[in-house]
Amino acid sequence: MATLFKRFTPDLYEACYSVEEEEDGLRLDKYLARFFPSFSREQIKRKISNGQVRIKNRPHPHKPNSKVYISEEVYIFTPRGELEDELWDGEKLPLPDPTLMAKEEDLIVVNKPPFMTTHPTGKHLFYCATVFYEHEFNHTVHSIHRLDRETSGIQLLALNPKTATRYTDDFENGRVKKAYFLIAHKTKDPGFPFSAKERMDHDMNFVPRVFVHCYPEDSQMGRSAHTEFELLIEKDDYYLALAYPQTGRQHQIRTHAAFHGFPLLGDKLYNGDPTVFMRFKDQIATKDDHQLMQIPRHALHSVGIKLPDKDVFIADLPYDLVEWMKSQLYLDIDQLTQMIQKRVKEKLS
């Protein structure tokens, strides 16, 4: 399947593909399944019947059993609609715009809201940082690093490949200093401040496979990982803390925190029962699951970044975590913000 072009806007995704030799004679619905692996057969059939799939120089709408032939061009249109709505216990969640923190030459620094992806992937085609700023600046935008979809906070983007490559190299070679704010359940005292150095890896025999396991620091299993943790506030059954990852493993902060007895608030994967994650994934989460999580996403926020040639960037706390801390812990957010800014500047400078 040869891609002729892709175009993304916050409301419409357009793509054009050329049918290749090995695809000659395929049914249209089976051909489309290659591009939409997360779509059900019924969703693909609806796209065809709604005229969102068009074979060049043929009348449309087509039928699912229409055949495609070598060198034909197939145009696919995907309007945003309800495709990326985020629901929590039956209620639609707000999806706010990212906040531009700084634009310095070809570097863009933004405060990414929760549930926004870095760039289009899977079924997430619209609520993406690169798509938003390409539409905003009418210019191609490149990602420099990636944040998990649920993780909010500082996201770096570039306006040209050279700048993206330069700063990506800084991330990959450990020249970027990072700070994350987190809210966690207090199940035991890990002895703040401390360094977590357990190694990490996936276990392909474990379900869900995305779960990252910890292994002893002197183990031959997994890959080395290092996170420093610092306590900000201990209140009721919760810790508010800062994490400073020294390596960049997948789920590193969440995995180390859970292993040391303080799983993140709202973490469906590392809360002690991974089947909760599967129920949310399959959209069959129970009332008890929602009550256990308390909030729709894990409470992790990229709050500070220091590039080798820049001052420290510090992001405001996200609206959803602020709301929870006010209503559940009755915290003075201004005082907390000042504490975070002071600690992060001292640590990253």
What are these regions (language model features)?
Residues 2-349:
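RNA pseudouridine synthases
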